Curated annotation (Swiss-Prot):
Protein name as catalogued: Uncharacterized protein slr1290
Species classification: Bacteria, Bacillati, Cyanobacteriota, Cyanophyceae, Synechococcales
CDD domains named among the record's database cross-references: DUF820-like
One Pfam entry name: Uma2
Family statement: To Synechocystis PCC 6803 sll1609 and slr1290.
Species of provenance: Synechocystis sp. (strain ATCC 27184 / PCC 6803 / Kazusa)
InterPro entries: Nuclease_put_TT1808, Restrct_endonuc-II-like, Uma2
Length: 190
């Protein structure tokens, strides 16, 4: 058994050890090149936004072949042994049904931004996801203002960044869904 105290660094683990260890943890951790990184808790807005997006996706995709995951569902970064914990993910790829611990081929990944993770979500984490041939949409949703950035991969394989704000309508081509931005932020205080 691997023990960890808050003051000690996480031990370096193999991917298999990480997945076994992570199943027994209360908190979520991402895994990158043998290192474990604790994922902090989110704000009330963060939680509400994640639930609303998950519900929206579930209602839209109900009865189909796609699966929607919350932050408990890890993504294995394609062609690596690294794992992330996005706030919401959608996969429609049958290869992802083989694992009970993670998916590898999402078509949509959502990160609800926190001040402490925003730079990583926009930079390093996007670069990890961008190499996935199945990923079409990467949605970055602010939890401190009404603003959403959609990174959409076009037919040429180029990533376009589209910004949405209050009263805009957002389209996720990856799952064939269009919705009003205001639906996600209704009643939230900033």
């Amino acid at each position: 058994m691997i023990a960890h105290s808050p003051s000690a660094p996480f031990p370096k683990l193999s991917p298999e050890e990480y997945l076994q260890w992570e199943e027994r943890q209360r908190e979520k951790h991402e895994y990158f090149d043998g290192q474990i990184y604790a994922m902090g808790g989110g704000s009330k807005n963060h939680s509400v936004i994640s639930v609303r997006l998950s519900t929206l996706f579930c209602n839209h995709l109900d009865g189909g072949d796609c699966e929607i995951g919350n932050s408990d569902l890890k993504i294995q970064i394609v062609n690596t042994q690294n794992y992330t914990c996005p706030d919401v993910s959608v996969t429609c790829d049958p290869r992802d049904r083989k694992s009970t611990q993670f998916i590898t081929y999402p078509c949509l990944v959502v990160e609800v931004l926190s001040p402490s993770t925003e730079a990583y979500d926009r930079g390093g984490k996007f670069r990890l996801y961008a190499h996935n041939p199945m990923l079409q949409d990467y949605l970055l949703v602010s939890s401190t203002s009404v603003e959403i950035d959609l990174y959409h991969k076009n037919d040429d394989g180029d990533w376009l960044i589209l910004n949405y704000q209050a009263s805009d309508r957002l389209e996720l081509k990856s799952i064939g869904l269009s919705f009003a931005v205001d639906v996600i932020y209704r009643g939230l205080a900033f």
